[in-house]
Design a protein with these regions (language model features):
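General marker for long, soluble alpha-helical cores
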Residues: 1-327
Length: 327
């Protein structure tokens, strides 16, 4: 009797009695109890047992120091009254369940506890960030095998210092238009493979795009190979000719469009500049200014370069010019 009762004791009684009550009309009378206390599992047993007659929507005060999120969700489903979890210092469970129980107003007493995730598959990066926003405690994600989401979402989650245990899992990016510099950031966060199969367009500076293809060649990134992106868009106003050559050598027959419309300046050796300005895949090139890096240069090759662009050619690095007087 009374307004509060131990669910631990009631659950123990239920277990002791076993199936005996299945043939009896009498039940354990807990109808006068307004608050049940005990572990989450024992409270759940009390609230769901057919042998216990309890009042509708009792209050619950849990005693767990580590509470299982999935069990807490089941307890919450049995009562609309207060569920107090103030004693818990750790919440464990799958990320989606943990995120649910940490939501403001779902239960009381949470918000500063540590979190231990038990997922062994993929977890959405947005869920990791959401969990971090709902507790000030540390979040152990060492069991997670894959982090998935947009590059922005993934990089945000990796950047949260309170999330530990990440660094060797796979990543699956969902961007259809993928920023190469953001891909580089993701690649730097994990030793696992970053899958970009969803991407149809890769864009960024020439150096960032070239680095993305290098990462693919090194098997740190997957999805930029034979069945990779359809379009490569080189952004920015200045590019090293060597990076553009790297991109040209990396794109496959499946890439239907290589764009560099924003480029106004090329840098690099004369031979690299001639090579890329002669490349038909870069249809937007031909009017850029070129700053060559050679110190020794044949005049004939300089003339060839000059014929490849309508822009000015700067040869201030050249200290020795060779060739015929006519050149």
């Amino acid at each position: 009797s009374g307004t509060s009762a131990s669910a631990d004791d009631i659950a123990s009684l239920v277990t002791t009695v076993g199936t005996a009550y299945s043939s009896l009309t009498d039940k354990i009378d807990a109808s006068g109890i307004s608050t049940f206390t005990g572990t989450a599992s024992n409270v759940l047993t009390t609230l769901t047992s057919a042998t216990v007659d309890e009042a509708a929507n009792p209050n619950v005060t849990l005693s767990d120091s580590t509470v299982d999120a999935a069990t807490l969700i089941l307890v919450r489903a049995e009562t609309s009254a207060t569920v107090d979890v103030s004693t818990a210092t750790t919440v464990s469970g799958e990320a989606s369940d943990v995120n649910t129980v940490l939501a403001v107003g779902y239960v009381t007493g949470l918000g500063t506890e540590a979190v231990t995730l038990t997922d062994t598959g993929a977890v959405a990066a947005t869920t990791l960030s959401s969990i971090a926003s709902r507790t000030t405690g540390t979040i152990n994600a060492s069991s997670v095998a894959t982090v998935e989401g947009t590059a922005d979402a993934v990089n945000t989650a990796y950047g949260i210092a309170r999330i530990s245990g990440l660094g060797n899992e796979a990543v699956t990016l969902s961007d259809t238009t993928l920023d190469a510099s953001k891909l580089a950031t993701t690649d730097g966060y994990t030793d696992g493979v970053v899958n970009v199969d969803a991407a149809t367009t890769l864009e960024g500076s020439a150096s960032a795009v070239a680095a993305a293809f290098d990462a693919n060649d090194a098997n740190r990134v997957s999805g930029l190979g034979a069945t990779g992106v359809d379009t490569v868009n080189v952004t920015g106003t200045t590019a090293a000719a060597a990076d553009l050559i790297n991109i040209e050598n990396s794109v496959t027959d499946g890439v239907t469009d290589v764009e560099a419309t924003s480029l106004t300046n090329l840098t690099g050796s004369t031979e690299d500049a001639i090579t890329i300005l002669s490349d038909t895949d870069f249809e937007d090139l031909g009017d850029e200014a070129v700053e060559i890096s050679d110190t020794t240069l044949g005049a004939a090759r300089l003339n060839v370069l000059d014929s490849k662009t309508d822009g000015a050619v700067s040869a201030t690095s050249v200290t020795t010019l060779t060739g015929d007087v006519s050149d």
